[in-house]
Curated annotation (Swiss-Prot):
Keyword RNA-binding: yes
Localization, UniProt: Cytoplasm, Cytosol; Cytoplasm, P-body; Cytoplasm, Stress granule
Positions of modified residues (N-acetylserine): S2
Name of the protein described by the UniProt record: YTH domain-containing family protein 3
Any Pfam family hit: YTH
Sites marked (Microbial infection) Cleavage: Y157, P158, V538, P539, Q570, E571
Modified-residue entries (Phosphoserine), positions: S23
GO MF: mRNA binding; N6-methyladenosine-containing RNA reader activity; ribosome binding; RNA binding
Role according to the record: Specifically recognizes and binds N6-methyladenosine (m6A)-containing RNAs, and regulates their stability. M6A is a modification present at internal sites of mRNAs and some non-coding RNAs and plays a role in mRNA stability and processing. Acts as a regulator of mRNA stability by promoting degradation of m6A-containing mRNAs via interaction with the CCR4-NOT complex or PAN3. The YTHDF paralogs (YTHDF1, YTHDF2 and YTHDF3) share m6A-containing mRNAs targets and act redundantly to mediate mRNA degradation and cellular differentiation. Has some antiviral activity against HIV-1 virus: incorporated into HIV-1 particles in a nucleocapsid-dependent manner and reduces viral infectivity in the next cycle of infection. May interfere with this early step of the viral life cycle by binding to N6-methyladenosine (m6A) modified sites on the HIV-1 RNA genome.
Boundaries of every YTH domain copy: 416-550
Biased composition (Basic residues): 244-254
Segments of this protein annotated with the region Disordered: 1-52, 243-277, 304-351
InterPro entries the record matches: YTH_domain, YTH_prot
Species of the source: Homo sapiens
Amino acid sequence: MSATSVDQRPKGQGNKVSVQNGSIHQKDAVNDDDFEPYLSSQTNQSNSYPPMSDPYMPSYYAPSIGFPYSLGEAAWSTAGDQPMPYLTTYGQMSNGEHHYIPDGVFSQPGALGNTPPFLGQHGFNFFPGNADFSTWGTSGSQGQSTQSSAYSSSYGYPPSSLGRAITDGQAGFGNDTLSKVPGISSIEQGMTGLKIGGDLTAAVTKTVGTALSSSGMTSIATNSVPPVSSAAPKPTSWAAIARKPAKPQPKLKPKGNVGIGGSAVPPPPIKHNMNIGTWDEKGSVVKAPPTQPVLPPQTIIQQPQPLIQPPPLVQSQLPQQQPQPPQPQQQQGPQPQAQPHQVQPQQQQLQNRWVAPRNRGAGFNQNNGAGSENFGLGVVPVSASPSSVEVHPVLEKLKAINNYNPKDFDWNLKNGRVFIIKSYSEDDIHRSIKYSIWCSTEHGNKRLDAAYRSLNGKGPLYLLFSVNGSGHFCGVAEMKSVVDYNAYAGVWSQDKWKGKFEVKWIFVKDVPNNQLRHIRLENNDNKPVTNSRDTQEVPLEKAKQVLKIIATFKHTTSIFDDFAHYEKRQEEEEAMRRERNRNKQ
């Protein structure tokens, strides 16, 4: 590349350009005016170097390469995309000074006329500087590099495209009436625009490169910055700038009630919300004591006042709420609702009580006959009706024939076998006690029949009964006959059982599982006896422990307490069975 020297002469002289290392023909001679488009950018660049006092002066080893092409002849379209920054090389590191990459991040465009230099790099003339767009002006680029810091340069695009006004030290617009913010750099101007709520919602949003009108810019300027008089700029301190964001705070006060506490005194809505969960006429939450019995749903709906009364007062009101006995077929409904008032205060000694379907009131006493005096407080005297009195002779007859819960039981077996029986429901337990029979599954019947035959009368075969999910054993019976596989009892709650054998009930009492859980069976993976399957055999030594605990346990409840209830259920099931058989015919 040949070295060319250009004489800088005043504009208008017609001197020729002298070129070294070559001759010039007449057709190659050019005037100074021909270099005007190319020399304009070089002239601007000669005055664009920062002073020596700038702490961010670039290293003089980094060459300054100008952009060799001019965009003065290119057409300017306002509908194009945003300008792409001109990426330059890295500045050299020297003397420990800070150097930055003068790319699109730091090198920000200046006025619309040209781009200000950054760290000694040449500007990039994004907007053309010909006469067609002389209204924008380029005079602001000459003294722009004389600012105190390299960070003072900021965007010079039209204010509507950036949402703020042009700061001091930037190039303005030739025919624009915008006034500059005095003494505020780009960083300070950015801080003034930090507003939480923002009152510039009405401002027109523009993108870089769109057409702007002077009236639109004037309206935006009035919304973004306060009006400044044409007098001398007043020095602005940081304290004054810090006070500016506090102006829109009164508009944000309603937003503070949402839940973000910004003030020292809570707003009234928060105080009102603290009363959630209380009654409208009272200020305290009405809660029942932890030890108070839980009232049934009907009692709470009818009279909510007993919630805060002592338990004796609550129990005394129950006969008034249910003065008339319901129909016999409704016996199963009211009794479970009234039973908690009677049983729960006195049944603290019960452990792992099965809540369903045992809690149906002490309609019968296991030591004496049935009578109206045996009904507890709050229990509806349903069994006193003529239809329920028919059940009492059945229980009395059973107690007269069988000596239930004997005190002289010999649990120390020398020869015998013991099996676990798991029943699906207490209905079948009731009918087994009533008819002295039992039936297991097909596999269970075979196992029990083989065990009974193996003893050959040399010892008893005891069955330990427990209902699935009850949490207790309900009694002990002795197997008295072999299994009749062809017999069909027709009394069970489910019609799928086939076969039967005779049993004799010895103990009828509820023994909680926690009384027997410590006894483990080595023939059942060392599991507790309470976790056994149906017809699971208990080894003789472990069976002695189980029989001893059941025989000596002082029980408080048994299935006899609900005997009348299960009698009524059996009558209903038989009536439904007869109805189905009649429909089949």
